[in-house]
């Protein structure tokens, strides 16, 4: 099953893509809330990764929509953001994110995170 990612930053997208290739994970990118939810419905990924600093994804609203939809609520949602955005991290947790971490921790554990999304 693919992993769905909502990440605006092209450098970070390429890092995710390269790491996914290394661990044999299929990654699909989506940007807007409608795209993310539509891809989640059609692909049924085991994991959705959301950059909480995304300007296109409405990250907190999209996480809430995922978790409020009975067909999508079981999909694990991981958010990441700059550690200085404590309010954004708290909002993502409040919206139902399964895990929220600083961007540096996400980058450092990316291979493990992607591998965990394979099952």
Region locations from a protein language model:
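Short hydrophobic/Thr-rich beta-strand motif most characteristic of the beta2 strand and flanking loop
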Residues: 25-31
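Output/docking surface of receiver
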Residues: 96-108
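Acidic, metal-coordinating helix/loop segments flanking the phosphotransfer/catalytic sites
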Residues: 32-47
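Alpha4 helix (beta4-alpha4-beta5 surface) of REC/receiver domains from two-component response regulators
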Residues: 84-99
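Conserved phosphotransfer microenvironments
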Residues: 50-66
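Conserved acidic segment of CheY-like receiver
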Residues: 1-10
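A short, hydrophobic beta-strand element within the central beta-sheet of small alpha/beta folds
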Residues: 74-83
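Conserved phosphotransfer cores of two-component systems
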Residues: 67-73, 95
């Amino acid at each position: 099953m693919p992993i769905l990612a909502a990440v605006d930053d092209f450098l970070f997208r390429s890092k995710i893509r390269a790491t996914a290739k290394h661990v044999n994970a299929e990654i699909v990118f989506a940007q807007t809330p409608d795209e993310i939810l539509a891809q989640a419905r059609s692909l049924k990924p085991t994991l959705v990764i959301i950059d909480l600093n995304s300007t296109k994804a409405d990250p907190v609203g999209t996480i809430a929509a995922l978790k409020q939809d009975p067909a999508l609520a079981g999909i694990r949602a991981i958010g990441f953001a700059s550690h200085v955005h404590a309010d954004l991290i708290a909002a993502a947790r409040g919206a139902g994110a399964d895990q929220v971490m600083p961007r540096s921790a996400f980058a450092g554990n990316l291979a493990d995170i992607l591998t965990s999304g394979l099952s």
